Amino acid sequence: MIELLVVIAIAAILMLVAAPSFRTFMNNTRLSSTSSKLLTDLNIARSEAIKRNSRMLVCVRNTAGNDCAAGTNWAPGWLVCYDNETSSTPGNGIPDGKCDAVPSGGSNVNPIVLGSALSNTLTLLGPSAAIRFNPNGSQGVPGAGTAATLVLSLNPSTGITRTVTVAATGRISKQ
């Protein structure tokens, strides 16, 4: 009987020591997998822009999941879509930061990628405007020379974050 109590006491102590480490491991895994998914979708957008010789957007998705929404909170998810218009006037060919119909030829799926909403344990903050990849693979408005940064963190904050940066050249990195 005493041996059983000693074994139970030792097991309880080991569980108390292991639980915080396991929680940290799970949080790091959650951040890593989400930031890797975002990195993959950004790379898809860049490669599609080059392949199609057209502009592609990565932006916060609206509730319908078919167009961009405003705001810096990317937790509702994101989407990758084709952008070729500036206004409600079809055919003018100037980018407006909205998803447009894909021209005939090739895949007509738009949005191309639809990132799902994040769990309530994660926060993703990014630019309020869409991240735009140009036909040459560069990012942003030509000549602007600014990087786009997205920061993924735990909610509530633990100080552990992952940052995905898209340089003006189009290079995508994760820290």
Indicate where each model-derived feature is located.
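N-terminal helix-rich module
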Residues: I13, V17-S47, R55-Q175
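Glycine-centered recognition micro-motifs in short, flexible terminal segments and loops
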Residues: M1-A12
